Amino acid sequence: MSERLSGHTLLISLIATPIRHSLSPKMHNEAFAKLGLDYAYLAFEVGNEELADAVQGIRALGIRGSNVSMPNKQAIIPYLDEISPAAELVGAVNTVVNKDGKGHLVGHVTDGTGAVRALAEEGVDIKDQIITLSGAGGAGTAIAVQLGLDGAKEVRIFNQKDAAFANAEKTVEKINSRTQTKASLTDLADQEAFKKSIAESSIYIDATGVGMKPLEDMSLITDPEVIRPDLVVFDVVYSPAETKLLKFAKEHGAKKAINGLGMMLYQGAEAFKLFTGEDMPVDYIKDLLFNDQDK
């Protein structure tokens, strides 16, 4: 990559914490190199406390765009000049574009489309399905909304009663009023309702981040009876490649156990297009990422 850097190189960033596990820098930098684009992608350890300064830095330094991950996807919105209609519906942002590098920051969301495409690539069609989703943060909200837009029969959201719960109530209202999908929200502490919902669902999606460091020894599902041969289990975490949830699902005979690598790839491809105006070489990047994960 050093051979590509020059005084004209445009910088793209990632602001999140924790950050060291992220494959986004590799994905984007390899794509830039493959296409001969004079861009570089760097990750910065940024939480909510540093977020305002980080956004000001994007403006001041002329950084052309940034991906945004936990815990900043909702917190960043007040610092932006504009958000896309999809981001407004979701109430979260995972991609920021600095229009012409002049400091006008526009927020977008690509998580939901990335997740649905990742499922489709695994042969899983969400249309007319009952889906249980745990987690109502930025990623979970984006997925829930996209499931509604793409025709799921029901989306049953479970989340602990934290700051995200009130936002999830608004998300449920939006899905019910703007799509044909029936959405509901339940406290994750109600384990009987949680298990019953999964028993009635064909797809279970965990968007909580449980299973990623430092919670790699945890899983929201610990009862083998919850796992069925016709149940698809999808965890948005991709590092580790096999979370405790996915290992448990495989051991107890789930139809499919899918990690978040595909979601990361496809949401990244959409962000890449927003940053550069070019199509990411998805097949090339997919081979690189999946081969690395298999080592």
Swiss-Prot record:
Short name of any one Pfam family annotated for the protein: Shikimate_dh_N
Organism: Streptococcus uberis (strain ATCC BAA-854 / 0140J)
Domain of life: Bacteria
Descriptive protein name: Shikimate dehydrogenase (NADP(+))
Subunit structure as annotated in this protein's UniProt entry: Homodimer.
UniProt KW Magnesium keyword: no
Pathway(s) served: Metabolic intermediate biosynthesis; chorismate biosynthesis; chorismate from D-erythrose 4-phosphate and phosphoenolpyruvate: step 4/7
Family (UniProt): Belongs to the shikimate dehydrogenase family.
Residues noted as binding shikimate in the record, renumbered to the chain: 22-24, 69, 94, 111, 238
Role played: Involved in the biosynthesis of the chorismate, which leads to the biosynthesis of aromatic amino acids. Catalyzes the reversible NADPH linked reduction of 3-dehydroshikimate (DHSA) to yield shikimate (SA).
Alphabetic keyword roster: Amino-acid biosynthesis, Aromatic amino acid biosynthesis, NADP, Oxidoreductase
